[in-house]
């Protein structure tokens, strides 16, 4: 519009056009030059910043807050779970396949509601005492955020309420200076990772590597909807045939189905961990680590650490009720195979999600110190004969929620180096 009006004004209009154009040109030219110079400076600054960031993201091992290669090096920092707000999971097919028949009425009645409050209160007290003892032993203790697990959530494939943040071992595994979030397989545990994000982000900001495995959809195809469960005999037959409630529709695994011995990590195919999940871990950790699949005579495999618990270099507790099919692999490597004593937990004590063999689900503070249940005297004597000092803590009520000391913890930092114990 300005140019049209000026042209109508004759020669003065033309001069005005020339004047305005020249001024506008000089203004634009100056602006472009300044912008270009500013962009160059910003780019140079960004390059320097990125270079600095590159240097900052690879800390020396001694500076990284996350560093653990096995189950027995001196423990410096650990995450301990919470019993607060724990809910009974809805009685879905994957829960049914992982629990014993005598507890099915409990799940049918209480699914989606709190665990018995008195029992939960005792469990909270026990875990607080466990944390205090760990601190007295010189270990830094971190705790997940409190979460309201009663909230119902819905995805395009399912809806559920939550479970708890009691067992960090189930969802987190530390390999070197990397912390890996497992995808899980129970729908009630889909959002369990949220309780740990504050801690993990802190580790990440301080230099740790952080990986989240592919999150499964947990659609119906992940589960064998017709999985036949009628008796222990049925479970034995199915396990022997390699049949589980989870299919190979997509990768899934719980971190507790893996146990570490330096460069070698042992995993089992279970009700919550499929071969695709193990393969994802194998590819992700190669070539620095070797993932081996081992199996057991177990009618209900779920989490390896109450069946096969490595307590030192070349030393493993092997459950006599669930013998390892590949035990010769360890014998040939010169390992010491220890058979733990029969647990003495009373028959009437509720174990809604686990077996009595939580007695061997111990936490090594180092090669010469172990955290063991105060009630399990035979297990204590076994360790004492091995020259290992027992740190006795009562977590009998906490056991009812599905785990022992190893399950209730995730060792974040142990003082040690990457070695091979199988060659």
Curated annotation (Swiss-Prot):
Which of the residues bear the PTM N6-acetyllysine? Answer: 385
- Whether Membrane counts among this entry's keywords is yes
Mainly localized where?
mitochondrion
State where composition is biased (Basic and acidic residues).
52-61
Q: Which UniProt keywords apply?
A: Acetylation, Membrane, Mitochondrion, Mitochondrion inner membrane, Phosphoprotein, Transferase, Transit peptide
Q: Which CDD domains match?
A: amidinotransferase_AGAT-like
Q: Report the residues modified as Phosphoserine.
A: 46, 49
Give the transit peptide range: 1-43
Recorded metabolic or biological pathway in which this protein acts: Amine and polyamine biosynthesis; creatine biosynthesis; creatine from L-arginine and glycine: step 1/2
**Listed GO CC annotations:** mitochondrial inner membrane; mitochondrial intermembrane space
Q: Which residues bind arginine?
A: 170, 305, 322, 354-355
Query: EC?
Result: 2.1.4.1
Localization in the cell: Mitochondrion inner membrane
Q: What does this protein do?
A: Transamidinase that catalyzes the transfer of the amidino group of L-arginine onto the amino moiety of acceptor metabolites such as glycine, beta-alanine, gamma-aminobutyric acid (GABA) and taurine yielding the corresponding guanidine derivatives. Catalyzes the rate-limiting step of creatine biosynthesis, namely the transfer of the amidino group from L-arginine to glycine to generate guanidinoacetate, which is then methylated by GAMT to form creatine. Provides creatine as a source for ATP generation in tissues with high energy demands, in particular skeletal muscle, heart and brain.
Entry's family note? Belongs to the amidinotransferase family.
State the protein's name. Glycine amidinotransferase, mitochondrial
The organism is Macaca fascicularis
């Amino acid at each position: 519009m300005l140019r049209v009006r000026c042209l109508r004004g004759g020669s003065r209009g033309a001069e005005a056009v020339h004047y305005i154009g020249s001024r506008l040109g000089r203004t634009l030219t100056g602006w472009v030059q300044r912008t270009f110079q500013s962009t160059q400076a910003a780019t140079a600054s960004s390059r320097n910043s990125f270079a600095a960031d590159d240097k900052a993201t690879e800390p020396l091992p001694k500076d990284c807050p996350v560093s653990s290669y096995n189950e027995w090096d001196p423990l410096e920092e650990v995450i301990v779970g919470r019993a607060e707000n724990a809910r009974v999971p809805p009685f879905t097919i994957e829960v049914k396949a992982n629990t014993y028949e005598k507890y099915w009425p409990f799940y049918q009645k209480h699914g989606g509601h709190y665990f018995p409050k008195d029992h939960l209160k005792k469990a909270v007290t026990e875990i607080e005492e466990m944390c205090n003892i760990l601190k007295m032993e010189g270990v830094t203790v971190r705790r997940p955020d409190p979460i309201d697990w009663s909230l119902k959530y819905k995805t395009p494939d399912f809806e559920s309420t939550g479970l708890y943040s009691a067992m960090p071992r189930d969802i987190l595994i530390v390999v070197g200076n990397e912390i890996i979030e497992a995808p899980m397989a129970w729908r009630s545990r889909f959002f369990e990772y949220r309780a740990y994000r504050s801690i993990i982000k802190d580790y990440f900001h301080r230099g740790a590597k952080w990986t989240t495995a592919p999150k499964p959809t947990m659609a119906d195809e992940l589960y064998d909807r017709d999985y036949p469960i009628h008796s222990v005999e049925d479970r034995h037959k199915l396990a022997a045939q390699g049949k589980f409630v989870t299919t190979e529709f997509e990768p899934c695994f719980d971190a507790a189905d893996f146990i570490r011995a330096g460069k070698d990590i042992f995993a089992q195919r279970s009700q919550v961990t499929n071969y695709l999940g193990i393969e994802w871990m194998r590819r992700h950790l190669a070539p620095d680590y070797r993932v081996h699949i081992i199996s057991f005579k177990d009618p209900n495999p779920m989490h390896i650490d109450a069946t096969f618990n490595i307590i030192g270099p070349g030393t493993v507790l092997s459950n006599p009720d669930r013998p390892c099919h590949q035990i010769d692999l360890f014998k040939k490597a010169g390992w010491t195979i220890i058979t733990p004593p029969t647990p003495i937990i009373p028959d009437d004590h509720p174990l809604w999600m686990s077996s009595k063999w939580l007695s061997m689900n111990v936490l090594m503070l180092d090669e010469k110190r172990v955290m063991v249940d105060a009630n399990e005297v035979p297990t204590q004597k076994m360790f004492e004969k091995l020259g290992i000092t027992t740190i006795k803590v009562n977590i009998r009520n906490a056991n009812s929620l599905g785990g022992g000391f190893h399950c209730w913890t995730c060792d974040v930092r142990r003082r040690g180096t990457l070695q091979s114990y199988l060659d």
